[in-house]
Regions:
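N-terminal membrane topogenesis motif
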Residues: 1-41, 60, 64, 223-235
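Specific pore-lining/lateral-gate transmembrane helices of multi-pass inner-membrane transport
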Residues: 92-104, 273-319
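Transmembrane helical elements of multi-pass membrane transporters/channels
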Residues: 195-295
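Alpha-helical transmembrane segments of multi-pass membrane proteins
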Residues: 67-72, 108-113, 121-153
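Hydrophobic alpha-helical transmembrane segments
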Residues: 165-212
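Small-residue-rich midsections of specific transmembrane alpha-helices
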Residues: 63-89, 243, 247, 276-299
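C-terminal transmembrane helix end/exit motif
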Residues: 1-20, 151-155, 181, 198-222
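Membrane-water interface segments that mark the loop-to-transmembrane alpha-helix transition
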Residues: 23-31, 80-120, 315-319
């Protein structure tokens, strides 16, 4: 978060209403931009489906397939997220950047092999057609790389790079979806699912290019990070169970009395999902205010206090 704080402190030093609005706007875009863009993608695709005259069942199935794929990929990558972040912090501190990019490909390999096998089995019994299943599996593989790349880009504080990668993915998805459905007459469900997959594929390429810009390619072992996973195994399970805690209630609600079976193993709960999305949007202002208060007001005092311990401060200054 230090990268955000540095930019915010520069913006908040400027006086005037426009400067304040710009500072809050920057914090909002950086902190909530990817989440907002994800919501925008879902809502925008539903609007385009409505314009294309798609059946309500196809619209619900598209939302379920994309949601299931995103949540499944996020859950798989959450196991490595915290240990990899610790590995990155140690390597950057020790100035061993040559080990970072190989670890990215090594972690991707393990996540893709295990994740695609598990999600592929789910898709076989999910009731999806062969084309729908292949597109979902393709999107799942891309999102594993995307979530993993975001952990690496966050470590180097390239929040703008992450945001612009999301913007590019959304724009390409909308543009390609419109081209396929309205101009070429492709099937609505498969056309939009393909457009979303291509959009997130472009996002994956952009994030990979950003990583190559920051870190050198080398012949270091791609499995070095596994020592950190073994050493900090509780962190791995913390990340996994935190993610399960965030999203397990969705599965319970989808399988509960208010859930509806969209198709096969794909379930949804419109009476819950829509209010939940609105509730999520309502807390964004609080999230932005929290980030601003922590980075601009709290963090400078926190850093000054602990620097007294690390840099030989006297007792009088500390107390």
């Amino acid at each position: 978060m230090a990268g955000i704080g540095f930019e915010l402190k520069k913006l908040f030093r400027r006086k005037g209403l426009f400067a304040t609005l710009r500072a809050y706007g920057y914090a909002g875009v950086i902190c909530t931009g990817p989440m907002l863009l994800g919501v925008l993608l879902q809502v925008g695709m539903l609007v385009l489906c409505g314009w294309a005259g798609a059946a309500r069942a196809d619209q619900d199935l598209l939302v379920c397939m994309v949601t299931y794929t995103l949540l499944a990929s996020l859950t798989v990558t959450s196991f490595f997220s915290m240990p990899v972040t610790r590995f990155l912090a140690d390597m950057l501190y020790e100035e061993q950047e040559q080990t970072i990019l190989p670890s990215f490909w090594g972690s991707n390999t393990l996540l893709l092999v295990g994740g695609c096998a598990a999600y592929g089995i789910f898709l076989i019994f999910s009731g999806a057609t062969l084309m729908q299943g292949l597109l979902c599996l393709w999107l799942f593989a891309e999102m594993i790389v995307n979530w993993n790349a975001m952990s690496y880009l966050t470590a180097v504080k390239d929040y703008r790079g992450i945001l612009w990668a999301f913007v590019a993915a959304i724009g390409i998805s909308f543009g390609l979806g419109y081209l396929l459905i309205f101009l070429l007459g492709a099937p609505v469900l498969e056309g939009f699912l393909f457009a979303i997959t291509v959009g997130y594929g472009c996002m994956m390429l952009l994030e990979t290019l950003l990583l190559h810009r920051y870190f050198p390619q080398s012949k270091e072992s791609p499995w070095t990070f596994l020592r950190w996973v073994d050493r900090f195994l509780p962190l791995a399970f913390t990340g996994l169970f935190t993610n399960l805690g965030l999203f397990a209630h969705l599965v319970i609600i989808w399988a509960g009395p208010i859930g509806i079976q969209v198709k096969g193993l794909f379930y949804g709960a419109p009476y819950h999902d829509v209010p939940a999305m609105l509730a999520f949007l309502s807390i964004l202002i609080t999230t932005v205010n929290f980030v601003v208060s922590v980075e601009v007001n709290f963090y400078p005092k926190y850093r000054a206090y602990y620097s007294l311990f690390n840099d030989g401060g006297v007792v009088g200054d500390i107390v």
